[in-house]
């Protein structure tokens, strides 16, 4: 049977919370995971807020979609803000478990957007009549066609894929920040590891 135990660290090992290992590859290694997490959460909120504004215009101004869609999007935006606030508090307190709600929220958003994109593509493949039947639940398809052209389901798919890509990028960064906090807590408890703090800005 192979030995599954992790090899002990060398006696002269020096841990640094500012090691290049903790600079996010998703930012071309230009930012520490903690800094990148704040920025990615802010970008996520901007995207969600922009979506809420667009849904408000479409539901309350042009009346092309149901008003309930705007309220759902507004609720998602509020959840984004709340989970980001909890994440920021967790980073401040150096508690990686408090980042869990943000990661779960992002996973839900990714799944929802990918499903929405697939539905849009399938509707385009089956023709305009099928598209009108499916999307008629959400709004006035004829009005949407007048405002956004005949290939509007393609636009929905593109926006969904683009937003999902941003969410995946955000999740990678925040997961890296959580791993960083777990590492920091682990090495802080090791008696044979020198925890080297730096005054360098994260």
Swiss-Prot record:
Name recorded for this polypeptide: Protein cuti-1
**UniProt keyword terms in alphabetical order:** Cell membrane, Cytoplasm, Membrane, Transmembrane, Transmembrane helix
Stretches in topological domain Cytoplasmic: 1-37, 90-107, 170-202
Tell me which species this is from: Caenorhabditis elegans
List the record's Gene Ontology CC terms alphabetically.
cytoplasm; plasma membrane
Record note on disruption phenotype:
RNAi-mediated knockdown results in a squat body statue referred to as a dumpy phenotype, uncoordinated movements, and while animals can move in a sinusoidal manner, they cannot progress forward or backward, (referred to as a skiddy phenotype). Animals also display cuticle formation defects where the cuticle blisters at the point where the outer layers dissociate from the body, and furthermore the cuticle fails to shed and wraps tightly around the body. In 10% of animals, the cuticle tapers in the posterior region of the body.
| Membrane-side (Extracellular) residue stretches | 59-68, 129-148
- Hey, what's the signal peptide range on this chain? none
Q: Specify the domain of life of the species encoding this protein.
A: Eukaryota
Regarding the membrane, this protein is recorded as: Multi-pass membrane protein
Q: What is its main location?
A: membrane
């Amino acid at each position: 049977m192979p030995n599954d135990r992790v090899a002990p660290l060398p006696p002269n090992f020096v841990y640094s919370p500012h090691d290049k290992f903790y600079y996010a590859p998703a930012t071309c290694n230009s930012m520490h995971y903690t800094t990148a997490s704040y920025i990615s959460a802010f970008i996520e909120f901007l995207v969600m807020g922009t979506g809420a504004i667009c849904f408000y215009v479409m539901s309350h101004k042009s009346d092309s979609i149901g008003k309930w869609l705007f309220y759902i999007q507004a609720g998602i935006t509020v959840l984004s803000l709340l989970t980001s606030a909890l994440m920021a508090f967790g980073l401040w307190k150096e508690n990686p478990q408090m980042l869990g709600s943000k990661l779960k929220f992002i996973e839900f958003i990714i799944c929802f957007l990918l499903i929405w994109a697939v539905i849009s593509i399938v509707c385009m493949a089956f023709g305009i009549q099928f598209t009108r039947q499916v999307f008629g639940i959400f709004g006035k398809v004829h009005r949407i066609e007048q405002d956004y052209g005949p290939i509007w389901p393609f636009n929905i798919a593109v926006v969904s894929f683009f937003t999902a890509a941003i969410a995946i990028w955000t999740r990678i960064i925040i997961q890296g920040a959580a791993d960083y906090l777990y590492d920091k807590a682990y090495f802080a408890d090791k008696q044979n590891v020198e925890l080297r703090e730096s005054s360098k800005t994260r």
